């Protein structure tokens, strides 16, 4: 039987560890067994039990304190991840060979691990050799994404990971529970956006002609091919968490031997997929 994995990615502070913690609790409520593996050698603490912790293999602080290496924080992290890639047997021993595993990998936030280095791609390939079906879960902070240009920046980061890893990817806006009512209403247009409309709304802020020329084809690429879209993740709302989990399960065909339902928004194409969610939040 296949095994299943989520690679939980995103910038520092986007809520990766919180996502892992709340998703584990949500799955436990559904009587589903989910484990977490910490792959951030610079992590200080997290609010969930782990089945494996990369810090047992190597830690950033130890690398930075090594006088023969003399790495800073970023260099130390890269060294740790490259060392990890050369010691996948450690991870294999930690994971064991249990069928039907479902594991969340809490990954580091540095974008260069996905754009410039082969480490995460090598991890994906190794997991696939171990018969894992892997889905990327890319997180961005919804509070950061309420402005058009920041949203485009978040899209480029998500797109970089998607292209580099070549696996199904679900993109999520986290910390929806921290937004004001006004911000929640504003952010709905960013979940399944019309990129050309967003560009038109913000052209007055584009002072550089070169920047305008760059932004327009980027928006066109995303819009024409429907390459990036986002789901809202509100850890205080079970329905929001369930929608996210349904999309991920659908991407990796979790429980394909069971009767499976497609994510809810496919059932009613004529209406916005999150109209009900936002209406409930605005009425609170």
Swiss-Prot record:
A GO molecular-function annotation: GTP binding
Site (Stabilizes the phosphate intermediate): 74
Keyword GTP-binding: yes
Keyword annotations from UniProtKB, A to Z: GTP-binding, Hydrolase, Nucleotide-binding
Record keyword Glycoprotein present: no
Residue ranges of the region described as Disordered: 261-284
InterPro entries hit by this protein: Gpn, Gpn3, P-loop_NTPase
Chain location of the short sequence motif Gly-Pro-Asn (GPN)-loop per the record: 72-74
Residues given in the record as GTP binding sites: 13-18, 174-177
Record function comment: Small GTPase required for proper localization of RNA polymerase II (RNAPII). May act at an RNAP assembly step prior to nuclear import.
Subunit structure: Heterodimer with GPN1. Binds to RNA polymerase II (RNAPII). Interacts directly with subunits RPB4 and RPB7 and the CTD of RPB1.
PANTHER family according to UniProt: GPN-LOOP GTPASE 3, XPA-BINDING PROTEIN 1-RELATED
Family: Belongs to the GPN-loop GTPase family.
Stated name of the protein: GPN-loop GTPase 3
């Amino acid at each position: 039987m296949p095994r299943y994995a989520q690679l939980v990615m995103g910038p520092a502070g986007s809520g990766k560890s919180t996502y892992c913690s709340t998703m584990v609790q949500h799955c436990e409520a559904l009587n589903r067994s989910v484990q977490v593996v910490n792959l951030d050698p610079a992590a200080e603490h997290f609010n969930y039990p782990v089945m494996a912790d990369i810090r047992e293999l190597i830690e950033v602080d130890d690398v930075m304190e090594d006088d023969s290496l003399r790495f800073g924080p970023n260099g130390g992290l890269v060294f740790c991840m490259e060392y990890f890639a050369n010691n996948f047997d450690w991870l294999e021993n930690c994971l064991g060979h249990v069928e039907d595993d479902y594991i969340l990998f809490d990954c580091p936030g540095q974008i260069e691990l996905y754009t410039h280095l082969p480490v995460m791609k090598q991890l994906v390939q190794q997991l696939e050799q171990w018969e894992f079906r892997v889905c990327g879960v890319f997180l961005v902070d919804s509070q950061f994404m309420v402005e058009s240009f920041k949203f485009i920046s978040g899209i480029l980061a998500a797109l970089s990971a998607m292209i580099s890893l070549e696996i199904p990817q679900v993109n999520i806006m986290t910390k929806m529970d921290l937004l004001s009512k006004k911000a929640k209403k504003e952010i709905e247009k960013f979940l399944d956006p019309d990129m050309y409309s967003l560009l038109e709304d913000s052209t007055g802020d584009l002072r550089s002609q070169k920047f305008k020329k760059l932004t327009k084809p980027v928006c066109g690429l995303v819009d024409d091919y429907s390459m990036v879209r986002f789901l809202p993740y509100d850890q205080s709302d079970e329905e929001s968490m369930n929608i996210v989990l349904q999309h991920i399960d659908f991407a990796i065909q979790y429980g394909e031997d069971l009767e499976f339902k497609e994510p809810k928004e496919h059932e009613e194409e004529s209406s916005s997929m999150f109209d009900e969610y936002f209406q409930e939040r605005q009425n609170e």
